Design a protein with these regions (language model features):
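Catalytic center-proximal scaffold of phosphoryl-transfer enzymes
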Residues: 1-180
């Protein structure tokens, strides 16, 4: 098996350990989808906070996202640290700031723990390389929700779900036509 493998994960310890156990020399990446989910939540929190003269929260969060997109984890963590300390001074003034402050702190730890798995997503995207599992998750959600509509009264069997995943994997690997 001399096939290159790229693992995309949400950054959880268990998943990462499993990847390293299964195939240590493979490429291990943090899924961009999971980064943007967290960034989007922080932006929504920032929208609910009254503007201050001290810092433009949304602009700072955008900077963090930009640095991560370009694989500059060091600068992303610096900006995140600055944002964390700026918010720390405002925590007493507004409960919404406290929520964002905690989210930024959690995000800071998440990025620091997964820094070794953050590539230059912009370059990977430019060269047509996979950066996210969002398209797979979206497809699976569509198929499952279609199947679970009450009018159709269909339920998944273990065999049916397994067969669906085999077909989907073949389609994604451009192997589907070879089956026939």
């Amino acid at each position: 098996m001399n096939q290159d493998i790229t693992f995309l994960s949400d950054g959880g310890d268990t998943v990462r350990d499993l990847q390293l156990y299964l195939r240590p020399p493979a490429e291990h990446l943090l899924d961009w989808f999971h980064i943007t989910m967290r960034v989007t939540v922080m932006k929504q929190m920032a929208n609910g906070i009254p503007r201050t003269d001290l810092v433009d929260l949304e602009a700072e969060i955008d900077r963090v996202e930009w640095y991560l997109w370009h694989g500059n984890v060091f600068r992303a963590l610096q900006v995140t640290d600055d944002l964390y300390f700026d918010l720390e001074g405002l925590v007493v003034a507004c409960p919404a700031v406290t929520k964002l402050w905690k989210a930024v702190d959690e995000f800071r730890g998440y990025i620091a723990n997964n820094s070794a798995f953050i590539p230059n997503y912009g370059d990977r995207y430019l060269y047509g390389e996979v950066i996210s599992t969002a398209f797979v998750e979206s497809t699976i959600n569509q198929v499952i929700s279609k199947r679970m509509v009450k009018k159709q009264q269909m339920r998944w069997t273990k065999r049916g779900a397994h067969l669906l995943l085999q077909v989907r994997t073949q389609v994604l690997n451009d192997e589907w036509r070879d089956t026939f």
